Amino acid sequence: MWKLGRGRVLLDEPPEEEDGLRGGPPPAAAAAAQAQVQGASFRGWKEVTSLFNKDDEQHLLERCKSPKSKGTNLRLKEELKAEKKSGFWDNLVLKQNIQSKKPDEIEGWEPPKLALEDISADPEDTVGGHPSWSGWEDDAKGSTKYTSLASSANSSRWSLRAAGRLVSIRRQSKGHLTDSPEEAE
């Protein structure tokens, strides 16, 4: 069994094997063991140094510097802040602040085509082939394909309507199991 101690490699032989060879380890094995020891210390140092970054180093060395270098130190800190990559939360906020393109402005995007069953289902609700919902206004471009909620007063009504629609979709998906909506609940 190999043991490490004070910069050299020692070989411990069990008592029953002491009768055979009394010499040290073979030279190839000793060289391999020394390489392992050197690699282990280097890996250990890398682990310790990976815990700290350059900002920490500047902060720790700041106390040792003379008062003359305070101005340059501030400039270095400002440069580091400018060079720093933005963090996760900064990226998240930037992505939310960027206005996304409207679907009709995306290259290669086409509006969904309604099936004939959907168009013929509610003929009294359609005006010019598009459903007319009160409380919804046209976009700034005047497009009748895309609409947005006009007033916040109607938002609760629309949220209730959307919840009701979700329930009906859920019931339809369970339709193959039950015949009536009362049995589904």
UniProtKB/Swiss-Prot annotation:
It is found in: Nucleus; Cytoplasm. Keywords: Cytoplasm, Nucleus. The keyword Iron-sulfur does not apply. It holds the Pfam family TDRP. GO terms for biological process: spermatogenesis. GO terms for cellular component: cytoplasm; cytosol; intracellular membrane-bounded organelle; mitochondrion; nucleus. Expressed in spermatogenic cells, especially in spermatocytes (at protein level). Residues 1-29, 121-156 are annotated as: Disordered. Contributes to normal sperm motility, but not essential for male fertility. Belongs to the TDRP family. Interacts with PRM2. This is Testis development-related protein. It comes from Homo sapiens (Human).
